[in-house]
Amino acid sequence: TFNSVLGIEGGISVLGTSGIVEPMSEEALVETIRTHLNVLKAEGRRWVIAVPGNMGAGFLQTYLKSCPGKYKSKDEASGICDQTEQLDRQSSDCSDRNSSVNPSEQDEQKKSLEKSLVTMSNFVGKTIDIAAELGFSGIVIAGHMGKLVKIGNGIMNTHSREADGRMDTLLSCALSAGTEDLELLRKIQGSNTTDEAMDHLKQAGILEDTIRVFLKRAAWHLAHRSRDELKTGMIVFGTKGEYLGETDDAAEILKEALSELKMQSLCEEEDHRR
């Protein structure tokens, strides 16, 4: 399975007569991203939510349910709840406003959100390029730190064969965050995974500061890639789906995208009644 909005769901389609299944080329994957963005554009969307894959999508769902206020003002946090309250009636922050939504409507709204999420795989840069080319107003990327940490080093194709830079990014961010602990830096450099490196940073009490530096760097690289033709933002999560942080413009883009999704759902409901 790759993308339900394109009808690729619950299996694979084998084209041709040989019966031999071959992996999709990078070109085919990028064209799939383009097709999804074209679908959203045809629906009148201006704001994009992109995820690397199922993990990022799942983490984002959890984020929307919990409506965290970290890195946001009170108004911004409540704004996100206002836009997402109908996605899950069990959200403790949003349940009081959501009594009119029945379970079947919830399911439809969640499906609508899932269909709106653009699966970009490793192609961060290409996804931004296409979104800018098609005239979108902004894109927010959500996913696991282990994948998105590379953006802090300007790496826009996150496949392992293209580049790594994970530990170098975290090490330099820790230095910029103010650490002078050489032993900590050696531990980061010697870590096998991003999670291991972040554990060392957490034990040293400098994880949050390091992530803040990383997010500023990532924001710069995303804006540089977009040539400022559209707003860009990013939200990162830990291995267990815990919210780690977001870039400055992420909340605004997310709210705009969810507002569009809500309006589309209302229009579809009205069409269905007719």
Predicted regions and their residues:
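Short acidic/histidine-rich active-site segments
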Residues: G143
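Basic polycationic patches enriched in arginine
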Residues: C81, R89, C94-R97, R273-R274
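N-terminal loops that bind phosphate or other acidic moieties
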Residues: T1-A77, C81-Q83, N102-S137, K147-R274
